[in-house]
């Protein structure tokens, strides 16, 4: 089972405050573990514009029509002082990895330098930190019914209102997340 480019959808029973009602976009999943970004937990009153200002990134060719008041997300509890940028594919960034034909992750500053300009990727999600699972941990959590999984959807990742992402991700499975039980039967 490879869950790269999938969403993890927290079951209603998952009460860990870091992951309660979370949707995690899985960037990498292999025999060593998994890495993902929470896509529906914004950092309170912290925007992409704040990040650029704090890093003193002020592109000369800034396009005022491009909004930078988008939220920055709490991607997870690990390396929460580092930025992780999910975006639609675009060449030319120093530390980019293709996750799927529709999505890349970049950790280098050069992607931030394009934000607010005509050179920025079409869709961008900026997060601080990431979520990680060591070898076998995510698989155990799945067996314990902590998460649902579904293939990722770019519309949910980049365009669905933040407060609706948990519910909408579950809807891709044909379920109402509020009406499911957290216990699975075993025959």
Curated annotation (Swiss-Prot):
GO-annotated cellular components: cytosol
Entries under SUPFAM superfamilies matching the protein: VC0467-like (SSF143456)
UniProt xrefs under Pfam families: DUF179
Family assignment from sequence similarity: Belongs to the UPF0301 (AlgH) family.
Entries under PANTHER family matching the protein: UNCHARACTERIZED PROTEIN YQGE (PTHR30327), UPF0301 PROTEIN YQGE (PTHR30327:SF1)
NCBIfam families cross-referenced by the UniProt entry: PRK00228.1-1
Name recorded for this polypeptide: UPF0301 protein SG2023
Annotated organism of origin: Sodalis glossinidius (strain morsitans)
